Amino acid sequence: MNFAEAVRRAGVEFLRDEPLAKHTTFRIGGPAEWFAAAATLEQLETLAEVALAYGVPLTVLGGGSNLLVSDAGIRGLVVANQTRRHGPAAQFREQLQHPALRDDHWVAESGVMLAGMARTTTRSGLAGLEWAISIPGTVAGAVIGNAGAHGSDTAANLAWVLVRYPGCRRQVLTRDDLHYTYRSSRLREQLLGPREQKRPVILAAGFALAQGDPVVLLHRADENLARRRASQPVEPSAGSIFRNPAGDFAGRLIESLGMKGHQIGGAQVSPRHANFIVNT
């Protein structure tokens, strides 16, 4: 049985040479050698194991933000993570059995869009993710890169993350296990490591959220969203390009150099916010 047959046996259809420009917020990127979509955690895990068994490089693609894909594309298997379930822990008891799963946790599969989950939890009167209502990307991306805005970040409310290293069993890592720093984590370091090193596949995450007043929380979230819309570009981009240095802002530094609005080809330093490069 060859690789293509093994993927089909997993119940997943695949494409050859799929343009990744269709799957990134930058709207650029060459072809994926193999491309498949995982709608369930089981499919995601199976595809990771198939790739390992056949020695095919694996890349898991979330929302396509914070990502720059070469015109040469990506070799191996690119899996679009389309797992979308999230809700109170009780809904996941049968699927995710682990002592770290507490009744008061909000659980999300890794492909859940962060902004949509933040809107749902905020409307439900659960405090902690109001900052994320304007953030593109998935839960997995937020967990890996410690996404944040408006004075908070993912690490502030993350309780645990469920991962699988291909060839191994599922593991639950606590927030302390992830060694969070500004826009980074142990998971990010592992994913940026050498290809021969086993890289984690993020499956799900649990968030500890406090009870709050939905009206107050929604007002705060909407203020964050309005502030973002007023200050950030609407053109295709990967989001903020550079991390802020201590005590300053990357956008301010770039603007002070006179680079705001500078353009080469179709790439432009956004005239609205200098820490964004937009695809014109």
Task: Name what the model sees in each region.
Residues 2-139:
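Anion-binding (especially nucleotide phosphate/pyrophosphate-binding) glycine-rich loop
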Residues 29, 36-41, 68-92, 144-175, ...:
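Structural signature of FAD isoalloxazine-binding scaffolds in flavoprotein oxidoreductases
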